[in-house]
Structure formats: structure tokens, C-alpha cells
Amino acid sequence: MKLWGGRFVHESNSFFKKFNSSIQTDYKLVEQDIFSSMSWADALLKSGVLIKSECNEIKNALQKLLCIVKKTPNIVLDSNLEDVHSWVETQLILLVGDLGKKLHTGRSRNDQIATDLKLWCKHKIKDLFNRIIEFKIELIKISDNTQSVIMPGYTHLQRAQPITFSFWCLAYLEMIKRDEDRLKDALKRLNSSPLGCGAISGTTWNIDRENLAKSMGFKSATNNSLDSVSDRDYVVELASVASISMMHLSRFAEDLIFFNSSESKFVELSDTITSGSSLMPQKKNPDSLELIRAKSGRVFGFLVSILVVLKGLPLSYNKDMQEDKKGLFDALNTWSKCLFMSSLVLKNLHINSINCLKASKKSYSNATELADYLVNKGITFRDAHHITGQIVLEALKLNVPLEKLDLSIFKKYSSSIELDVYNFLDVISLLEKRNSKGGVAPKIVSKAIICEKKQLKI
């Protein structure tokens, strides 16, 4: 059944029908469409459009339909109808006859699709919160178990200063917590119902939109009908939240790919999330991480795509908006899968603490400590920086780490350097001194872990 056509003389071109149809994508909204239709039936009852028996008959039929699509959601795809709304209404009429034709009274597909999509987003956000929590738990578990694992921290992909693997985990935990906060904020802004706005200007029927909104689980009804049917800010915002988080997951993946490489050997990925080569028997490839890194591009692509779709649209609804769903479904599903895969990667991650420690003692990553030592001796930091650079150059020529240099070489560049310099250059001492808020000092890291475990009740 087609929901329009009375003013048309000629049938639609067959290719146009397929081109115009969205059912291959929006069939995923069938449960939301049925749910919102049941709430709409109640609203029509209260407004006098339906009597009690009619409302019950419609809702019972919709409930039967809901049970069917929950078992076989792809049943919608067996039709050649224009969209999911057409399918639900057609099935309803088959079940209750002409009574089903009353349901669309006062309602437009414009407010209907906006409502359905928001309902789907709310449901998907619950799944995303669960995935985020899973990932946070795995990060905290590894962080808790690796507080004593010293490794190099990097800037410009060069060894910079010693940190701990635990500290590295907490860095990504901070990122994912910000992602979680952004998702919470996005949920707040989409948690209003456009149902009852009609095509663009509201409805002439006495619909209590606030009560209708709450019956569907929304916090409130939207304020302006013209804006409500054309608003896709929540789609853009969710795409943005997903993109930022996927950027974080991509960096997480890149770090672990590097740590897992033959050049680093800081970690070893589990056999369960790696693959081999069809030619080279020795290979164990970090495919899980490489795919996370690659899939971020798909999510970024949708963010740009939806912005371009919306940027030139006049108020209010335009068919262009049909292009909002396929990319959104894919972006949020991709984000969810990548969060889950990231958790799987961490579950059985083996950390080679010996290799981590060896690497942290190379490349003069304790040079900053030497400069700070000189500052403690009364030398300005800029002069201390220059003196330390000269000493590092000497150590490079001798191929000796700073902590192994003879005291006479230190004194060659500054008479202020005494035997106590060796305590300053010790990697454990170095970590303990970084005890400012957010620092790598073991007591600071331990306190952060305890706090996070308490919040997540683990």
C-alpha cells in the first residue's frame, strides 16, 4: 500500500520507485515504528479520534506485529514498499481492516521518522554505554596489574621519559571517559519527542504531546514543530562523538601495534585476536588492531557526509534526510564493535616487563632529571638544559647511559655535579619524583586506580 498518490495521474517510474525507496535501510526502525504507533493510538484515543475498543484493537494488532518482527526482522525486506512506515500501516490494515487507516490521523511521516530514529538512537546508546564500561574495566584491570612495569614514554615516536604501562592505560581511560561524557550529553539533547508535530506546523487534533513523549520514554516534547521535523543535530552529534572515540581507539590500536612489533616486543597479542600469513609461516599479524585503526575512517566519513547533506537544506523536512540513517547505523555499530574488540585485545594481552624496562633505560630518557638536578644545585634551567645536552652528546660518543658515566665526565661540564647525581638518574627515583597531580609517580597512579575501581565497583 502506498501512503500517497491521490493527486497523481501517472504511475511512478519503476526505477524511481527503487531510487526513492528507503525500506532496505529503515526496516531496522520497524520495532520503533510499531512502538511509537502504539503510543500514537493512545493519544488518538484521548483526543477522541478513536474509541476505546478501536484503540485496543489497533494496539493488539500492533503488538502481534511487534512479536513477528522481533523474531524475523528481515520480513520487512520481503516487500517492495517505499519505507518502514508503509509496511507497518499495510500490515496493520491487513490485520484490522479499514480501522487501520485511522492511525495516521494527525501524524506525518516527517514527525514519525524523526521519532523513530530518536528512539533507535536511545536504544543504541544503551549498548554503547555497556561497551564503554567493558573497555574501561579492562583498562583498569591491566593498569592495576602493571603498576610496576616501567616502559618508555614517547614524543615524536622517540623515547622521551620513563613511564609505567599502568600510566599508559590510565591515559586511554581518560580519553574513553571523555567519550562517555560526550555520549551522555548527546543523549540529553536528543531526549525529546517530535511526535505530534505533524508535517511542519503541528496538528489540529487535541494531542497532549508532553504526555505522549513521556509514554515513549522521552523526557519531554520538542518546542518548535518546524525545527523538530528537520532537526538532525542529534545524528551529527552522535557521529561526532563516535568519530572522536574512534580516533581514540585508532590511537590505542596504533600504540599496541607498535608495542607488539618485532622492533619493540613490549607486548604480545593473544592468538585469539591475531591471524597468520598464507605465505610466511612465522607471521602473527595484529589484524584486530589494524582493523580498528582502519574502521575509524568509515566513521569519520559519515560525519563529513551528514554535515554536507544538511548544510544547504532549507527548512524544514527534505528528502535529502533519507540519507541520514544508513551511515548512522553503520557508524554506531562500527564504534560498538571496535569498543568490544578493544576489550578483547586487552583481556589476554601479555606484557613483557623485561623488554619494557630495558627500553626505558635507553635513549637517555633520564636526561630531564639531570637538568632538574642541576637546577636544584642553583643553575638556571636554560643553562642546565645546555649542560645536559653536552653531557648527553659525550655519553653518545662513549655509547654509555648517563647513569653509567664516570663522575669525572660529569664534572668536566659542571663542578656542581656530585655523587648524589646517580640517585637522581635512577629510573625508580625518577618515577617517584613525578608526584604532581596527574603524574606518573606510583602513589599517584595507585590512587587513580583505586578511585576508578571504586567508581565502577570492581
From Swiss-Prot:
**What are this entry's molecular-function GO terms?**
argininosuccinate lyase activity
Q: Which pathway does the record list? A: Amino-acid biosynthesis; L-arginine biosynthesis; L-arginine from L-ornithine and carbamoyl phosphate: step 3/3
Provide a GO CC annotation, any one: cytosol
Enzyme class, UniProt record, top EC level: lyase
Gene3D superfamilies associated with the record: Fumarase/aspartase (C-terminal domain), Fumarase/aspartase (Central domain), Fumarase/aspartase (N-terminal domain)
Q: Does the keyword Lyase apply?
A: yes
UniProt keyword Amino-acid biosynthesis present: yes
Keywords in UniProt for this one?
A: Amino-acid biosynthesis, Arginine biosynthesis, Cytoplasm, Lyase
What is the protein's name according to its record?
Answer: Argininosuccinate lyase
Instruction: Please state the gene responsible for encoding this protein.
Output: argH
